Amino acid sequence: MNFQLKKLFFVLIILLFVSTAGFSQKEFFRSQQVFTKEQLSDFYSSITIQDGLVLFNANDYYLYAYDKNDGSLKWSVETNYKSTIPVFVQDSIIYAGISKKEIHQAALFSLADGKLIKTLPFGPLATKPLIKNGMLYGTAIYDYGCIVAYDLKKDTVTWSRFIAHGYSRPPYYQQNKIMANAEADNWVELDYDGVLLDTTCAVKPDFFVEAIPCVKKFTALSHDGLEIKAKLSADIFGKDFIDQPDIITTKNFTFVLYNDKLSILSGRLKKKQQVQVSSLVVELVENDNTKLVKADNENVWILYSDHLLQYNHKTKKLVRLTNLTTWQPHSVLFDEENIWLISGKDGLLYGLSL
């Protein structure tokens, strides 16, 4: 091999290394809990960020609030409840789960100091609620799984509708109606008074909820409100879809991750792109902890084999590969140029600068 060929070969090797090497990151925060083996063997934990606070529902049944800028602990409260579902915050009120004498309930806490305001007459919220005109609409463990309407001022459940395991799927809250899941691809239309809107029964359900005679059949709604169903659903969600869909919508796109396949829909359910995630990082071995983290109109971020992938779906190129194997992330949350994660190794909360 002559000198010029050797030089070219060397440059190609360097470029290959640079293109696949993971980016480094700096750990600027680590929480100080010490979890027992028993607590970590029953791993339920979650995070969210609201009004400058990182809210950490930890494996020790406490809810912690940290200042996201300096990492200081603002407050902590024992809830005797832990969940992979993050707490919800609106109008400086935290909606979280609480457990007393092995009875699980939803509860309100003050965002400012963590003090318990009151418990609610139903189980912990399973999806992000809608608060509108003094009413809370949400899904919860109530009468074995319902969508409920709760009057915040009167402290009463105004109405509820049994939807079985559909309570774990976020409803679609639209201007004049709610579309709630009632297991699998069955969806029921309700008005905000809890009245069933579909009485034609053009489509009948294939589940055991007798109080819901009429449904719509689809897997999910796209970013532009169209039903993803039939052949398209089978292609992007799989033919035997029963799990929670891994889906993110932006103003212009719908992103779906199923197994190793990323599907991107543009307007009117048009398939803009499909890509095998493993083809972007052939050096990594896929594991079960693969999920969408964030997406916008140019990039999508995916947690894959303890790495964070940033994929530009406009240029169809991998932009960045961040190695997170040190922390074995259980869940990841973006905050501007930083990420917060819960380690699957020790259960602690970490803050990393990218």
PLM features per residue range, with description:
Residues 1-28:
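Bacterial Sec-dependent N-terminal signal peptides
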